[in-house]
Design a protein with these regions (language model features):
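Structured catalytic-domain cores with a bias toward divalent-metal coordination
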Residues: 1-458
């Protein structure tokens, strides 16, 4: 919010000429209001307490980008669909590590399926430019989000491979063809320092965008037009090592007594330590992801409607009762009808275009034959249990009934749709139990309930 007065007062006239800002000051309003001194106890302030990571449903909003289970995530997706921003930023404070010397770390979308030009602009131009500017103006070192792990030859600064999944907001931005940026201020830097350096990030990144508006618009427009049909896209990925070592900065922290909770000290890296207390090391950097498994992006995804009742009830894991995303009209209908209603609900939440077939028609494409269908024993983000399928695609010729669901891939959100619908995706509808009305049936179905085709379906 600190950027608003400077813009209103005329200090940022360049922004006024070339940018429109949409500001959500508090994404997790419910969690923000649940202030307690015991929340995030080791974080350096505010010492009088802070809110919770989870919202009122007990869900982490930064895990809701694909399943769309919260009102907050749905509101964000609606805003992105309606306003079509070119750049989006998510501002965080990290959980912290004992001796990182970076007051600010940042990240972009790590998903390997992002448009190449989009990632080049962010990683090769925008982020290096603002990092250099902040170092020159303020003397502060910034780098990509991560932490040191490993010993000996394996010691390296590593990001988190989980961030390649669009359940995380910054990657969700990326697979929607938006230039997504994540900031993670260091939790053991003082509260003042975190606020100030976040302002610097906004100041420099917005100034860059304002002065490179034509480039930004062009990159996003090209990503929206670019067809991924027929490409091999990632469904699983891993971090890879950068070709050159990177300078990683370290600085000590101290334990400080919290005046409100005597037995819960917090960690602090005091302001003004000076260079004498700062060390650095040249380390390998694992900060981008490459595919470990790929598959074909089709022209269309199809969910054939079925009016046949199941022979056994689904052993499904569903969202919490207060969550969004259930089948319209409750649990009525066949398993396929309930599943389709849940899929349509989420497609609409994301803004993904779809259609319903008006008449029976021949279908020629592929179906995924299931070899194994497993459900994780642990609950995650409410009552979800991760589902994983193995198997193989095989050719299929069949009649597609009227009332079937068709999701075309000639649309700007095709990258997101691919991740949501592929049976091997580690962050799609299958993984999040959205298809469990069918996939949870006993005995397990022989085929994945979503078909793909390189042919158009009307």
């Amino acid at each position: 919010m600190g950027c608003v007065p400077s813009r209103a007062s005329g200090e940022r006239n360049a922004w006024l000429k070339t940018t429109v800002l949409l500001i959500n000051p508090i994404y997790n309003a419910d969690g923000n209001e649940r202030v307690a001194v015991t929340n995030r106890g080791s974080q350096a302030g505010p010492v009088g307490g802070m809110g919770t990571r989870e919202n009122a449903q007990g869900l982490d909003l930064n895990r809701d980008g694909t399943k769309m289970e919260t009102a907050e995530a749905r509101s964000m997706a609606s805003l992105l669909t309606r306003y079509q921003p070119h750049v989006a930023m998510d501002l965080h404070t990290t959980d912290g590590s004992a001796n990182s010397g970076f007051n600010m770390t940042y990240e972009t979308s790590l998903n390997p399926n992002n448009a190449n030009a989009q990632m080049r602009l962010l990683r090769d131009e925008l982020l290096p430019a603002i990092t250099t500017a902040v170092k020159a103006k303020h003397g502060s070192d910034w780098f990509y989000y991560g932490g040191v792990s490993g010993t000996g030859d394996q010691r390296a600064w590593r990001s988190d491979a989980e961030l390649a999944k669009p359940r995380y907001t910054s990657t969700y931005f990326g697979v929607r063809n938006i230039l997504g940026l994540l900031t993670e201020t260091y939790s053991y830097a003082s509260f003042k320092t975190r606020i100030v350096e976040t302002y610097w990030f906004l100041e420099e990144s917005l100034s860059y965008v304002a002065s490179h508006g034509d480039t930004v618009r062009d990159v996003v427009a090209k990503a929206n037009r670019e067809s991924i049909i027929g490409q091999q896209l990632a469904v699983r990925q891993q971090l890879v090592k950068a070709p050159v070592l990177q300078k990683i900065v370290f600085a000590p922290t101290i334990s400080v007594r919290n005046p409100y909770v005597a037995d819960r000290p917090y960690r602090l890296r005091p302001d003004g330590l000076g260079n004498a207390h700062v060390t650095s090391e040249m380390l390998p950097f694992f900060g981008t992801a490459e595919p470990t498994e790929t598959t074909l992006a089709p022209r269309v995804w199809v969910v054939p409607i079925s009016t046949t009742a199941a022979s056994a009830p689904a052993q499904a894991t569903t969202a919490a009762p207060t969550a969004f995303g259930g089948a319209r009209g409750g649990a009525a209908g066949t398993p396929t009808q309930r599943m389709m209603a849940a899929v349509i609900d989420r497609l609409e939440a994301h803004g993904i275009r779809y259609s319903i077939t008006a008449a029976d028609q021949p279908f020629s494409g592929d179906r995924f034959k299931i070899a194994t269908n497993t459900l994780d024993a642990r609950e995650y983000q409410g009552s979800h249990k991760a589902r994983t399928l193995t198997g193989a695609w095989e050719a299929a010729e069949q009649t597609l009934p009227a009332g079937s669901l068709v999701i075309p891939m000639d649309q700007p959100l095709a990258r997101l749709a691919f991740i949501l619908l592929d049976p091997r995706s580690d962050d799609g509808f299958m993984w999040w139990n959205v298809l469990d009305a069918v996939l949870g049936l006993s005995p397990t179905p022989a085929y994945y309930p979503v078909l793909r085709s390189m042919n158009a379906v009307k």
